[in-house]
């Protein structure tokens, strides 16, 4: 639903009259209220040794609602803001640790010549530049280790997005620790560069989180996002009470549109350093294909492979994952989807664990979901 503040209050005519009377030009402004609701049912082959049927929130996409707005300041410049909250459709609770606007909350200026500068809690460049490949795959790399599914947001952040010049565009972002006792005590930064030409686009991105789960600075750039149980590698495999002292992510990926087909590929390199001085190195490879059979029916298939190495315990875990989906659009705003995700642990990995589910008791796990999504 799109509206303006003036229209909602029924004062557009009155304000226009006052503006004419005062012979003063007023800048145009608007606020959009938007949202997405998604849920369904699912079957999981093995969670702790048992089969399970579940009612699930966010089967097609994570639910959210929010406000975004602009004000025209003239000469190609405008003020912008976004406030966006996540929630669980099945129980009504707030997501992102109960934050009022945990998905996004920022304000800034956008200029046709100089780009956009925003401040607040924002996505990093991994999400912006290569996350769409993960989203299009209808799956998540194990433990969202490369943040392709944006479980980690960057707060206290200043973010600049360049205008597009000759097909190129870039982003630089810095998240302050806000700590009086340590500049690097839970600070973060990220960079991104993208190129688009006709039906082809390719992007690279880098993000680094320093001391992301700081016991002495819980209001830093990453804060308690890092405590999420969904992030399987935030703690050391040697000492499970030791969180990462640093996480570095390099990722590159993009798409090619070929008629009714969308082909995507992505590679990410993730390096953890833990407080106990151990290290984990993960590499993710993803291929995805989505095909519009008709304007209403989209079929998707994707394969992901993750390879890792723990230095101290000298283990090399691996995971293979296949994602299949049939998505049917009942209208421009409502769709239903049948999705299958299957994961196979290999190498030194002891169990499979699809994102959002409890771990399997063995090296295999499969989930089948049927859900719907409605946007407004």
Residue ranges and their predicted role:
Residues 20-27:
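Sec/Tat signal peptide C-region and signal peptidase I cleavage site
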Residues 29-35, 71, 75-79, 113-117, ...:
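Outer-envelope beta-barrel architecture signal
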Residues 39-45, 85-89, 123-125, 174-178, ...:
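Transmembrane beta-strands of outer-membrane beta-barrel pores
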Residues 61-65, 103-107, 154-158, 189-191, ...:
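Hydrophobic, lipid-facing positions within transmembrane beta-strands of outer-membrane proteins
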Residues 192-323:
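Detector for outer-membrane/organellar transmembrane beta-barrel domains
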Residues 328-330, 362-376:
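Outer-membrane beta-barrel "beta-signal"
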């Amino acid at each position: 639903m799109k509206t303006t503040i003036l229209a909602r209050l029924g004062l557009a005519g009155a304000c226009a009259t006052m503006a004419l009377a005062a012979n003063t030009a007023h800048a145009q402004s608007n606020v959009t209220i938007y949202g997405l609701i998604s849920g369904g049912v699912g079957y999981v082959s093995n969670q702790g040794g048992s089969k399970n049927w579940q009612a699930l929130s966010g089967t097609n996409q994570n639910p959210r609602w929010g406000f975004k707005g602009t004000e025209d300041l003239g000469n190609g410049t405008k003020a912008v803001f976004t406030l966006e909250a996540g929630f669980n459709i099945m129980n009504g609770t707030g997501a992102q640790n109960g934050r009022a606007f945990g998905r996004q909350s920022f304000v800034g200026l956008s200029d046709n010549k100089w780009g956009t500068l925003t401040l607040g809690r924002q996505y990093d460049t991994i999400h912006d530049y290569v996350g769409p490949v993960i989203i299009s795959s209808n799956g998540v790399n194990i433990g969202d280790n490369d943040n392709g599914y944006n479980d980690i947001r960057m707060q206290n952040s200043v973010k600049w997005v360049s205008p597009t010049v000759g097909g190129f565009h870039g982003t630089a972002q810095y998240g302050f620790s806000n700590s009086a006792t340590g500049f690097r005590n839970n600070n973060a930064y990220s960079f991104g560069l993208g190129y688009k030409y006709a039906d082809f686009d390719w992007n690279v991105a880098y993000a680094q989180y320093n001391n992301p789960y700081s016991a002495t600075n819980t209001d830093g750039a990453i804060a308690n996002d890092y405590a999420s149980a969904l992030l399987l590698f935030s703690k050391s495999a040697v000492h499970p009470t030791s969180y990462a002292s640093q996480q570095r992510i390099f990722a590159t990926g993009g798409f090619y549109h070929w008629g009714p087909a969308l082909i995507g590929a992505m590679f990410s390199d993730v390096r953890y350093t833990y407080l106990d001085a151990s290290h984990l190195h993960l590499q993710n490879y993803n291929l995805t294909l989505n095909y519009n059979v008709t304007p209403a029916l989209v079929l998707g298939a994707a394969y992901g492979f993750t390879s890792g190495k723990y230095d101290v315990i000298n283990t090399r875990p691996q995971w293979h994952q296949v994602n299949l989906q049939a998505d049917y659009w009942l209208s421009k705003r409502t769709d239903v989807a049948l999705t299958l995700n299957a994961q196979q642990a290999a190498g030194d990995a002891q169990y499979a664990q699809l994102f959002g589910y409890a771990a399997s008791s063995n090296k295999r796990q499969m989930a089948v979901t049927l859900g719907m999504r409605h946007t407004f």
